[in-house]
Amino acid sequence: MEFNYNIEGGNFSRAGTASSEVKKILKQLNVNPAVLKRIVVALYEAEVNVVAHAYEGTMQVSIDPTVITVVIIPDIDLAMQEGYSTASPEVREMGFGAGMGLPNMQKNCDKLTIESKVNEGTKVTMTTFF
């Protein structure tokens, strides 16, 4: 099963919409609740990163395994450090941009791969086995 979700940068009112839809699908497939929670946390973090840091992104989900593609921070090593954030003061005032997005994504999936090209974007692939 494959699904594509467009994510609009800066639109915090819709942040979490794609991850919520994926959660519903996985619940219908009777995915183990503990695994489901990990997947949804990782998806939500990826989605919020797009909203907070990019103009737009695409979440491509393939069930078994789950794969997600989004646009994120170009400096991957720095971005993986807990607490690092490029979020604007406005984003931080809304409660986002704590610098935990990528570390939380890594903790909540079985495999995380990040490919990035400056001025072109970043592809994040998360795989979780259930």
Model-inferred region functions:
Residues V40-Y44, V48:
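Short acidic amphipathic alpha-helix that forms the conserved interface helix of the HATPase_c
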Residues M1-V41:
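Bergerat-fold GHKL ATPase/HATPase_c domain
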Residues M1-Y5, E47-F130:
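Conserved beta-strand-loop-beta-strand hairpin that lines the nucleotide-binding pocket
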